[in-house]
Amino acid sequence: MFERLLEEAPLFFNYPNFVFILEAMGRTLGMTVVGCTVGFVVGLIIAVLRRSTSLMLLPLRAVAIAYVETFRRIPFLVILFIVLFVIEPLMPGSSLFVIATVSVCLVATAFLSEVIRSGLESVPEQQIEGARTLNFNSLQMLLLVVLPQSWKVILPPAAAFIVMFIKDTSLASQ
């Protein structure tokens, strides 16, 4: 058995296969960077929206909750197929890279919004009350009080998600 492996190893470890693996690795890392960047920006918006208590934002909050709960429960490969079968009739001839990138962004946004929301909720309520006492508006409170304190809670699970997500995006890299 080991002899056969040694005999067929040169068929696998050749230049065209090496180039193919490097190209797939580049696509995987590229989709991970794009997906996590978009996911972090949109996820921050969704996390803030989910924490909102305004009655005007209640319908958007419900949509955000449904989006996050749906996309976190569907496997990535299934989302790839769903996006393929939704985008292809709407935009015929769209590249598979675009379809894969849209899928990656949808999944990353759902997962990272939960990571960010958990970090935002880790800030003690007394800190937020203190910011209200100082007449901070909602944006100042978020940028100057809540986000700086929540980074220490957000970064470890976000880094773990990025490592896990590299494995998921390899499904779409070929």
Please give the residue ranges for each predicted region.
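Transmembrane alpha-helices and adjacent helix-loop boundaries
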Residues: 1-174
